[in-house]
Amino acid sequence: MRVSAVAAVLTALAVSACSSAADGEPGPDEFLAPLGPMVTAPPGAAGAPFTDSAVLRAALIDVGDLPVGFSPVADPEEDLGLPPASEAAQSDQSSTDPALCSAVLSPVADQHPGAAASASAWFQGPNFTTVDQDAASYPTAADAAQAFTDIQTTLAQCTGYSGTDADGVDVQYRVGGRDGRPAGDASIGFQLVTTSDGFSLVSDVAVAMTGSTVTQLVATGQEPIDEGVFEDMTHAAVGKLASAPAS
C-alpha cells in the first residue's frame, strides 16, 4: 500500500498544481546525501518475539505520538477486507526497473519472509503529508538481524531507479542517506525522493531493530519532515515496541 499511496499523492499534487519546487529551482533529490555505511545488527539481541499480529499492531505508534493534525487511515486490506491492489486493479501498469527495487519501502515482512507476526499503521496529515509504520517480529533475533541486513542490501543497489505508476506514468526514484540518533539495538535512516510529471515527494525513513522485531517508520510530504519531530517519532515507535509485552 505504501508505494501506491505515494503515487496517489503525486497524482493529487499534479491535479492541484502544487509543486514542491518551482521551475528553475533545484529539486529535493539534488541535496540527497550518500547512503551511510552498512550497520550490523546484533544477532543475539534480547527480546521475545511477538507472535500475535493484533498485539504487535497495538504496540505501534498512534495519533498521540504524532504532530497535531494527523488522523488514522484505514488499511484497505487489513481494516476494510479489500483484495490486494495487484488483484483489484486488472489494468495496473505499475512497474519498477530494476525489479528488485520494488522492495524499497515495502513492509519489512515482505522484504524478509518468515515473520511470526506483522502489522502496519497509517496516518494522514495536512498538505499531502503521511506517516506510516510497519513492523515484523521474527522467531529469533538472528532472523531479525538478517531482515535488517536485507533491507540495507536492497537500498545499496537502488540509489537511483525508475518505474511507472498504475496508470503507466513514468516515475523516478532517488535514495540518499539521512542522519539520526541511534534507536533500538540497531538503526539506519534514509530518504527517498519520488518524482513524476515535475512533482516530487520526499520520504524520510527510519528502520530499527529492537529485540526480534524490525520496524520501518516513513514520513512523506512535499518537503522533508522536521528532523527533531522525526527523531521524536522514531524513538517513540521503537520505545513502544521495546516496552510492549510480546505474545
For each feature predicted by the language model, list its residue ranges.
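A short, solvent-exposed beta-edge/loop patch
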Residues: 127-129, 171-235, 240
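C-terminal motif of bacterial Sec signal peptides marking the signal peptidase cleavage site
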Residues: 14-17
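Extracytoplasmic/secreted envelope proteins and their assembly/folding machinery
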Residues: 53, 57-63, 67, 132-135, ...
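A small/polar (G/S/T-enriched), proline-flanked helix-loop surface module common
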Residues: 73, 77-194, 245-246
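N-terminal export and membrane-targeting signals
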Residues: 1-10
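N-terminal "mature-domain start" segment
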Residues: 19, 24-118
